[in-house]
Curated annotation (Swiss-Prot):
PANTHER family: CHROMOSOMAL REPLICATION INITIATOR PROTEIN DNAA, DNAA REGULATORY INACTIVATOR HDA. Transmembrane segments: none annotated. One of its GO terms (biological process) is DNA replication initiation. Coiled coil: none annotated. This is Uncharacterized protein HI_1225.1. The lineage of its organism: Bacteria, Pseudomonadati, Pseudomonadota, Gammaproteobacteria, Pasteurellales. SUPFAM superfamilies: P-loop containing nucleoside triphosphate hydrolases.
Amino acid sequence: MNKQLPLPIHQIDDATLENFYGDNNLLLLDSLRKNSSDLKQPFFYIWGDKGSGKTHLLRAFSNEYLINQRTAIYVPLSKSQYFSTAVLENLEQQELVCLDDLQSVIGNDEWELAIFDLFNRIKASGKTLLLISADKSPSALSVKLPDLNSRLTWGEIYQLNSLTDEQKIKVLQLAAYQRGFQLSDETANFLITRLARDMHTLFEALDLLDKASLQAQRNLTIPFVKKILNL
């Protein structure tokens, strides 16, 4: 039996809207901001490939709510093996609910029913903004419960547009700057050409390099990066 963890209440981390590169997704960001201050559309479905920024965006909005003394919860459904559907109870009392990686629980009858019920409770309460992310569009998910399938299309649906290589370099350099070190164009370009191009992989590498450079008191030269990442 899997160990059941308590409700995964979100704590503030370093994901912000300022370090989310939103130039490719301005319509989505504008609509989210408008609804966070004046709730007219409570449901948003955001989909895209791995590393496209879905998790960052959901956590950033959660952070913004919490920093402004508003109630918010982020639920990583990719870790649903560690908690039960009870985590969704009473979430209609929150101002913001973020369900990340919906595809992780699709096909599970208990989870599909629990999310369907949450949709209905949020619609009835009229006080909650619900953000859902997945790796596919609603029509491409193999949802078993027809009523949930229809609920997923109730609100606004957006595909996160992927970043160009040039934009990825800017994102990495901004993240490095916020951590207190510099990432040259040459080194950043080396990273995106030698590693998988999804931002999740690139940020993991950046975190590793940050710790290694601090410990070794070294700048992030290409030879040093090669050594640390075994490239």
